[in-house]
């Protein structure tokens, strides 16, 4: 048994290295060329048992590809203590010692602090951590996170890595974006209606996508976090203050976003949010479950299907508007979802969301779902004004809807947040922010 466990550990470390080498050559900017570099983040704290297989895999990896092809960057906190604001180096010294004991020697130290590090602090860290003083980087507090790459470049990071920053205009474009972000004055607010609102990291990719789109339309973004269950009618009896607060937050927002999720908690609240946005011409974006609840709402309140629901929440729904996909196994739910990047083909010549994506006949986006809009009711839905403008390669599965005669009411079955980047926001998010800012689509 012990021998089997050891063999399993070896296999894991090999697979980690294989994965890194494979993804390091995948295009990351939407083009066909391989990337110049691959950044691998190993989170947590040095010495944690959870990260030990990855640290050992990286230790081996440096010899597998050659030490000249790997740079280890250690990110550490330099706390400021006492009334005089002394910068303490002991935490970083200790973590570097631990890391070197595990076989990894950092080439660069990136040190977080509230204020720029003094030369004395840098020299002390260099002496005790076995790195060049030029390789000790200060990353202090800045107005927005997009200043951080500029801060590192100014301290000579590109020179250490052997990168010619004059060979591209990307850094200058990034600099312009970072400083423009400091000057934004016009606000735009988006209501995020979800079930995990106490932990915003649950929606980190969605938040970043909203920020990317807000930068593009030159607006300061504020997110109104709304617990979906607080919008439900029964919550008025349970806690009237939370009910009123949730509805006030929704009504004060310029746009509404319902992200993906699983389970029935808060679903009726999401349906109420979709109805409010539809009836009041408020920009709306539904992602995955957000598309499904908007479809259910439309069936109930436009088509008169009072019992419409998803079979995920009611297996005996009178009108099953959203159903379990026939090819998915109900026995092994975790391994049989419709996953990964898949094409969606346009079904119309022109619509708002298609114009945002561009002129291609299809779009590739990442999926993660088990349920779909019931194909049997699509014709009824479209006749009432909700058009399924994007479908899968079979032409049967609905991927994108857009509502006629609405400023912006869009649902997507996939997860566009995973492809959004600074300077290249995801089209569905860009459309939401443009409409919420009063800009013409």
Residue ranges and their predicted role:
Residues 1-7, 11:
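Single conserved hydrophobic/aromatic residue that forms the stacking wall/gate
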Residues 24, 53, 62-63, 69-166, ...:
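Internal gly/pro-rich beta-alpha loop/helix module
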Residues 34-38, 70-71:
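Loop/turn-to-beta-strand initiation segments
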Residues 36, 102-109, 276-283, 361:
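Short, surface-exposed connector motifs at secondary-structure boundaries
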Residues 145-207, 211-218, 222-238, 247, ...:
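Acyltransferase
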Residues 46-54, 84-85, 201-204, 261-272, ...:
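Glycine/threonine-rich flexible loop motifs
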Residues 4, 32, 247-252:
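A short, aliphatic-rich alpha-helical micro-motif
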Residues 249-345, 350-352, 414-416, 422, ...:
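Cysteine-nucleophile active-site neighborhood
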